[in-house]
Amino acid sequence: MPKQTLERKYEYHRMLPHYQKARRTVFITFCKANRIAFTPEARDAILHRCLHDHTKRYDLHAAVVMPDHVHLLLTPLRDEKGWPYSRPIILKTLKGMSARSVNKLEGSSGPIWQEESFDHVLRSQESFEEKLEYLRQNPVRRGLVRRPEDYKWLWVEQTK
C-alpha cells in the first residue's frame, strides 16, 4: 500500500486512539490553562511560534491567537521517512515551545496550556471554507475588532 494512503494510529493522553490519514487538513483549538487573557506581547510570541514550523512540519493555512485560546487550520507535512507529522507531535512541539517563549517573556514557569485540545479533520473544501471563515471572524465575534483584517494576531495564508 502506498504511504499516501496509510493510516497511523496515535494514542492521545486520556483519550481514545485517533487515526490520521496522510495530508488531511485539520482545524485545531487549544486553550490557556487558567483562561486569563494573554498579554499582547505573549500573543506576539505565540503567533511567532505557530508560524515557525510552517512549511517545515505543516502547511499553515490560517492561525488566530485569541486572548485565551488559539485556532489553527493546517495540513501536516511528511517527515524524512515519508510519514505525515502527527497532530500530537505538532501540538506537543507548538505548545511546549510557545509556553517556553511566554514563560521567558513573563518571567514565569510551568504549563500555560490546558492539556487537552480539540481537533477536527476536514473532509471537503466547503468545510475548509467554513472553518477558515470561523477562524477569521473569531476576533469580530468577541468584539475585539470590527473587521478581521484589523486583528493583529490573525494570520491567513496568501493564496496565489
Give the predicted meaning of each segment.
Residues M1-K160:
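Short catalytic/metal-binding and nucleic-acid-binding patches
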